[in-house]
UniProtKB/Swiss-Prot annotation:
Designated name of the protein: Photosystem I iron-sulfur center
EC category: oxidoreductase
Domain 4Fe-4S ferredoxin-type, residue spans: 2-31, 39-68
Name of the gene encoding the protein in the UniProt record: psaC
Amino-acid positions noted as binding [4Fe-4S] cluster 1 in the UniProt annotation, renumbered to this chain: 11, 14, 17, 58
Catalyzed reactions per annotation: reduced [plastocyanin] + hnu + oxidized [2Fe-2S]-[ferredoxin] = oxidized [plastocyanin] + reduced [2Fe-2S]-[ferredoxin]
Self-association state and partner proteins as the record states: The eukaryotic PSI reaction center is composed of at least 11 subunits.
EC number: 1.97.1.12
Pfam families: Fer4_7 (PF12838)
GO MF annotation terms: 4 iron, 4 sulfur cluster binding; electron transfer activity; metal ion binding; oxidoreductase activity
Primary role: Apoprotein for the two 4Fe-4S centers FA and FB of photosystem I (PSI); essential for photochemical activity. FB is the terminal electron acceptor of PSI, donating electrons to ferredoxin. The C-terminus interacts with PsaA/B/D and helps assemble the protein into the PSI complex. Required for binding of PsaD and PsaE to PSI. PSI is a plastocyanin/cytochrome c6-ferredoxin oxidoreductase, converting photonic excitation into a charge separation, which transfers an electron from the donor P700 chlorophyll pair to the spectroscopically characterized acceptors A0, A1, FX, FA and FB in turn.
Length: 81
């Protein structure tokens, strides 16, 4: 089972999701489109175990973890930006 983390425009740059992830999937990256100047990105989605701790930790419901199977996974990986 593979997972992809979708990102939206409500990130406040608090880093709660990064700290909550037990697999070090997330990291903060510079992003001019938000107040904080940084957002959570998921460059290591292959390490995601789907525990959704990042979702639970997020105060703005910024992250959405979805499970994708087979070929759909590779098409969906581009959503982690």
């Amino acid at each position: 089972m593979s997972h992809s983390v979708k990102v939206y425009d409500t990130c406040i740059g608090c880093t709660q999701c990064v700290r909550a992830c037990p697999c070090d999937v997330l990291e903060m990256v510079a992003w001019d489109g938000c107040k904080a100047g940084q957002i959570a990105s998921a460059p290591r989605t292959e390490d995601c175990i789907g525990c959704k701790r990042c979702e639970t930790a997020c105060p703005t419901d910024f992250l959405s973890v979805r499970v994708y199977l087979g070929g759909e996974t590779t098409r969906s990986m581009g959503l982690a930006y």
